[in-house]
Amino acid sequence: MSTLVESPVPSNDSQAAAPAAYDPTQKQKSQAKTARIPIKVVAAEKLKKPEWIRVRAAAPGSRFYDIKRILREHNLHTVCEEASCPNIGECFGKGTATFMIMGDKCTRRCPFCDVGHGRPDPLDTQEPENLARTIAALKLSYVVITSVDRDDLRDGGAAHFVECIAKVREYSPDTRIEVLVPDFRGRLDRALHILNSGPPDVMNHNLETVPRLYKQARPGSDYAHSLKLLAEFKKLHPEVPTKSGLMLGLGETDEEILQVMRDMREHNVDMLTIGQYLQPSEHHLPVLRYVHPDTFAMFEREAYAMGFTHAAVGAMVRSSYHADQQAHAAGVN
């Protein structure tokens, strides 16, 4: 495990141990990424994974390698690969993936996330076409499109999302599209205006954790702003289900999670996902607890009691894991 401490101001004596010169054009992963955030990860005792944490490998004869080949041929990224999702074997094996647009370099440095940080490359104008062709070739009936944060773009990438949605609908008119968007912080009004021209079938934005832990887990993000994004989109598109997700194990309490769920419902969020945080590497935020299945079951009961139309809750649940089944259960056909 690891602990978190505020970064001290380096003294002359510590300059020899300073990290290597930062090259913003290179994708920073793991230690290189987390070395330059205000909260540092310090190695400590590691919690043993309980028996209910089980990752499914790709089955023999599955489409795992076929999917990887197709993605590389079309110059596409998936959050499954970039974020080291534990469910990648199962999802790729079944021929599903969550597509990550606008490159593989994020402008944020969230220390729970394994997506690389760096100065993003210019947008690929061929990406919407490549994405649409790939989805059509795979004959997918439901897709999730997400992205890195693009704080370098005036609209946060909203127009690129709309272009991708339009192209997918052109090639696959019966395919349902869920988007998992960044927070568009500082660009919310512009982004929402752009999304009006081509809204998705499901609008997803993850709160990730409780507000008390935002400084450690989501530097550069704001809890109230993320709730506002979901609420404002819902006002503009009341017919489109909204969705958000949380990860457990960063030091939150059960009551804090329940309060976030109440906040979601007060902001008209329809669908919920809750899963166990798993540390991508020793340089990321530590797992401070492994949540028992009985506790996940309690959160699921409470979610339906609060009025969520669908709640996917469990240790291995991720925001886009079985997203098609989640959406179908919530009435998206």
Curated annotation (Swiss-Prot):
GO cellular component: cytoplasm
InterPro entries: Aldolase_TIM, Elp3/MiaA/NifB-like_rSAM, LIAS_N, Lipoyl_synth, rSAM
Cell inner membrane among keywords: no
Family matches, as PROSITE patterns: RADICAL_SAM
Region (Disordered): 1-34
Subcellular compartments: Cytoplasm
Pathway membership, UniProt: Protein modification; protein lipoylation via endogenous pathway; protein N(6)-(lipoyl)lysine from octanoyl-[acyl-carrier-protein]: step 2/2
Bias type Polar residues, positions: 1-15
Keywords, alphabetical: 4Fe-4S, Cytoplasm, Iron, Iron-sulfur, Metal-binding, S-adenosyl-L-methionine, Transferase
EC number assigned by the record: 2.8.1.8
Single GO MF annotation: lipoate synthase activity
Ligand binding ([4Fe-4S] cluster 1): C80, C85, C91, S320
Reaction catalysed by this enzyme: [[Fe-S] cluster scaffold protein carrying a second [4Fe-4S](2+) cluster] + N(6)-octanoyl-L-lysyl-[protein] + 2 oxidized [2Fe-2S]-[ferredoxin] + 2 S-adenosyl-L-methionine + 4 H(+) = [[Fe-S] cluster scaffold protein] + N(6)-[(R)-dihydrolipoyl]-L-lysyl-[protein] + 4 Fe(3+) + 2 hydrogen sulfide + 2 5'-deoxyadenosine + 2 L-methionine + 2 reduced [2Fe-2S]-[ferredoxin]
Binding-site residues for [4Fe-4S] cluster 2, renumbered to this chain: C106, C110, C113
Cofactor binding note from Swiss-Prot or TrEMBL: Binds 2 [4Fe-4S] clusters per subunit. One cluster is coordinated with 3 cysteines and an exchangeable S-adenosyl-L-methionine.
Domain Radical SAM core positions: 91-309
Cofactor(s) of this protein: [4Fe-4S] cluster
UniProt family annotation: Belongs to the radical SAM superfamily. Lipoyl synthase family.
Official protein name in the record: Lipoyl synthase
Organism: Bordetella pertussis (strain Tohama I / ATCC BAA-589 / NCTC 13251)
